[in-house]
Amino acid sequence: MSYKILSIILVIGTILAYITPETMPITAQTTSTVSNAANSYPISQNEWVEQQLQLLSPDERLGQLFMVAAYSNKDETHTNEISRLIQQYKIGGLIFFQGTANRQASLTNYYQSSSRVPLLITIDGEWGLNMRLSNTPAFPHQLTLGAIQDNGLIREMGSEIAAECKRLGIHVNFAPVVDINLNPNNPVIGDRSFGEDKYNVAQKAIAYMEGMENNGIMACAKHFPGHGDTDKDSHKTLPSVSHNIDQLHSIDLYPFQQLIARGVSGVMVAHLSVPAVDNTSLPNSNQTIPTTLSPKAIQQLLQQELGFSGLVYTDALNMKGVAGFYEPGVVDVKALLAGNDVLLFSENVPRAIEEIKKAIQRNEISQENIDQRVRKILKAKYRAGLHQYKPIDLNNIDTDLNNRNALLINQRLAENAITLVRDDNHQIPFGNLEQKRFASLSVDAPTLTDFQYALDRYAFFAHHTLKNSDPQANFDRKFNILKSYSHVIVSIHRTNKSASKDYGIDQKTQDLIRNLQSVTNVTVVIFGTPYSLQLFDKTPTLVMGYEDTHDFQSFAAQMLFGGISARGRLPVTASPYAVAGQGLLTTTPTRFKYTIPEDVGIQLGDLEQGIDRIMQEGMRTQAMPGGVILVAKDGKVIFEKFYGYHTYTSGKAVKTSDIYDLASVTKITCTVPCLMKMYDTGTFNTSARLKDYLPELANTNKGNLVARDILIHEAGLEAWIPFFEATLPAAIRSDAYRSQPDSVHYIPVAHNMYMSKPYYDMIWQRIADSKLSASGEYKYSDLGYFYWKKIIENYAHKTLDKFAEEQFYRPLGLSTIGFNPYKRFSIGRIPPSENDYEWRQQNVQGYVHDMGAAMLGGIGGHAGLFANANDLAVMMQMMLNGGYYGGRAFLNESTVRNFTSQQKQGSRRGLGFDKPEPNPNFKPSTSTKAPLTTFGHTGFTGTCTWADPQNKLLYVMLSNRTYPRKSNYKFINNNIRNRVQDAIYEAIERSKWYVKN
């Protein structure tokens, strides 16, 4: 029976077996079963291969050897040409280049539907699909991966890349590059290599390969026999490798041997002149034959000596490394005769097929040999699942590719790559922050960088920028400014790979850094090639950030301050002072890490969906104009998001860096920690009476009040006293206020509103004269905190704000927390708390909302503190850590445990801290899912913070629900704070990390 008749029969049978409702749109495709009237059964590899082979004439089988370049960003002319090659010449596969994922998927379906035998779809995706396709995840380049010590992360990356390839119908990824980059001036390999150490290269290549192969994508080791020690680009010419055969076996071939031993599916052969492998001269040239065209390189060395039996791919045949010596078609024949199975990127498929047919006629190669090559290709197609071909689902491709797992893997790779090259003065991670004045300088970034914004989370920074193109005068001015700071962190961006051009780092920049090093402490962080480290051999603190992306910039900053540990090691040698394998390891993290929920096993969707719904409801019902939510777990900030606007009418959007009035959260983030500090030193006793600290109260009804009773709100104090009413009406009481300060009116209560000193003194008398209710009954009161303020100030011999700043805020690196923020920040960063028509007759913005605290000059023991979400979270994390943060003990662990614990049966309160309500008959103070060990507080302005030791969980909510009127109780009545906390616990429950009591 002729092959044509057999082909017709097989096609008809295949179509009949294949037609189902799901597959009707696709024609002339293969099936996974062989069917007859009696039964159907799964088809074996050999059966399927022979079936497909018989579908093709001998001439058509030649087409299977070709893999043609396809683009998804070109026009219809290109698409039609590819379709013509598929239909007319039965080409075996496509290698996709630039374009988009959605377009490539559509084209793949179209091309597959045009092909009698399914096409093998491939891509150059060394750092993922993003190497060719826009808007897809970009993983780090291999040189960056060479710095990572945990190869399991690279295996995970390979698995994710495999999943993304499968989603796009790709079967082969031409990765990993296993070249050993021994030449810093290599123009084509460079950061595509894992580095210069053969063991490191091999181990990482194996991890990457196994990640793909174990998940159904065929890997391809390249560029055989090793393109690492070259100084020319084979795209443009024929590079030479001068290694002798022993060196090749010892170095260049080592990674190939290791991958072959572990079953790598493919090897790509490079266009290299390697006399030690084949010294046959090229015609009219003093160079030897390219390895792509050398039987000695492929059949003898690769297949016989190294034992490789998988698919052998040429490197692209349009590259000048071979195309510069032979005509199109001729070069294809020579590549085939050399032993290659797949001819990649042929310049002229029709001519190449004709030339191969001539070679068969000349008996240079047999049809049997061709058929064996085609069988290898078909077996690869079977292995790729093409015997069960299904078209690509075109729905949700972008979402599926840009998934949370890819983001998490990318972050972990960046985190583990950051390399602390040198730290001669033992500064990293930075400590004793209160003793340092920090400045940052970004070089050649267009604006303030993600690196600089990340630094802001850890300390107060003065940020500066310079560009290489700036005149020398600008550099001189920056020097005069920066030399006054104790620590300057210089980040270098937008570098290049050219050693002759100092990697894009201008001489002015190098001189500025050198001059700064002579007068202050300088840390240099380079987001570029590690070879550029040679320019900074005398920099005592040097960090390699590798890639100029958000993740690398963020984690470099985190490493400097102990948010993450330094783990990376240099993959290459830049100088005698920066050698391969060099990298300091720092201690375990001591400060917040900033990451994504998936880093602690929580899905962002689970967390965000519930929180967003409640916050949107709150804004829609005008329970609040906007706010910020922060969630930290296991010492990691996993969620920080802003919502809404500063007011209902302003149009000024909230930012996570905005500074809110904390109201009564002041108690547990200022006053109570100060009392705890005194408790640690033995100068405060919770069993003592007020008169022991304030003798002037001895003859009042307050003198015998016990500290513990005041802190748990059972001392009988009145809830509050409207002190401000004594100054009203302001229009009549002209003695009370002035618009400008003077010797009497100098207490600021609002913008251009200064209260007279006698009213300040009146406050203390009113409290002393106030009545007491029965002791032992719970009544929430602010009045005791007026006394705590005075007691702390008497002890410290300084104001409450200064003592808290000295003991906590500055050492913790908190840049926004404090009183009276209008003195330190632009008013635009501070959402207003109320349009106060009752007293101050103005928008209260940057001044404390609480009337009593305002009459104390904005510094109250019960209210007055402002902060952004991050600073508040750090303060609470310190207490969640048992008083420890940033490598430093701020409070004794036993003291924290004592103050944050429930103090007596029947009362939920800790010492100053609020806690979950244990009585189910009472209104919950927190989410009912919060364990009883949780501690925190709420604030009248719409704030709260809760720390849960059992789940190592921290929750911060900031809002200005009192704007424009404090009488708006929708926020409280709708239980916004607790419901957001519920949503957080529900997300944790779904992650199976939740602990209840």
Can you say where each PLM-predicted feature lies in the sequence?
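Short, conserved catalytic-motif segment at the N-terminal edge
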Residues: I602-L662, T683-N685, D850, K966, ...
